[in-house]
Amino acid sequence: MKIVFLEPLGVSVDSIESARKILRDRGHEVIIYSDRIPELNKERASDADIVVESNMPLDKDFFDACPKLKMLSVAFTGLDHIDLEECKRRNITVMNSAGYSTQAVAEETICMMIGLYRHIVENDSITRKCCGKSIVPGREISGKTVGIIGMGAIGCRTATLAQAFGCKIIAWNRTPKHIDGVSFVEKDVLFKEADIIALHLALNEETRNFVTARELSMMKKDAIIINAARGPVINANDLSEALKNGKIAGAALDVYDNEPPLKEDNVLLSAPNTLLLPHIGFATKEAFELRLGIVVDNILKYLG
């Protein structure tokens, strides 16, 4: 079979060549592109049996251009950038890379909590303007109540890391669990009691707009919210209004309704007390190496 990697996946040359060898030794043709150019995806994958990609959108036009395609090994956790209905209609197997970024995203969540609490961006700006004595005092996360929404692998790992900082953990999950040191509460209770809210939900019709003006109005005025899950789980307009009106103290976001770069008219760009990142939670060297292994394993499982 012809296997096409539409991008190099952010790993070392040695790692990518090792992956190539594993697949070639089993008799497959392997093409690995050293750059990422979405406009060339259809041309590059036109005669592929198996395609590897991360988070570039793949729609009906792409699949029309790839009539031989049998399998997608997606180097990403979420699949909302892929037309899964079209894949189902064409009997294309789709496998994601669940679990590769658990530690990376959990660490980023803690980083964003501290970044907001300690006003890292503002104090960096003060220092660069050579007026370092005019500091913005911060707060400590130790002793604060962290409310985690979505207790999958990332949510659980975030809880463990937050506990190491001395935080109290409350959580909401669609299916209640028993986890030592974690108190599971109703959604409304979490929004009312948490000092810091961290979202770790998958995106589906139930979780789209999971956080709206209603939930934001329940939060403490000095509370902050972190979203390292999927952008549409928070209503961006409602969040922007809550920040502008001082209903909550801050928000840190790594995900948005659409992948960065953000458009100039995005309402979050003008919202105060925000820490905005360009969707980097998954992006560590360690996570990328683990991801490549999962991608190759998925291909081998498919091939039998």
Enumerate the predicted regions with their spans.
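Rossmann-like dinucleotide/phosphate-binding beta-alpha-beta segment
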Residues: 18, 135-221
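Phosphate-binding beta-alpha-beta segment of Rossmann-like dinucleotide-binding domains, i.e.
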Residues: 90-92, 98-145, 149, 160, ...
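Short beta->alpha connector loops at strand-helix junctions that form conserved
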Residues: 34, 75-76, 92-103, 173, ...
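Short, well-ordered coil/turn residues at beta-beta hairpins
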Residues: 54, 75, 200-203, 228
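Rossmann-fold NAD(P) dinucleotide-binding segment
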Residues: 57-69, 84-86, 206-225
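N-terminal glycine-/charge-rich "phosphate-binding" loop or analogous flexible N-terminal tail
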Residues: 1-48
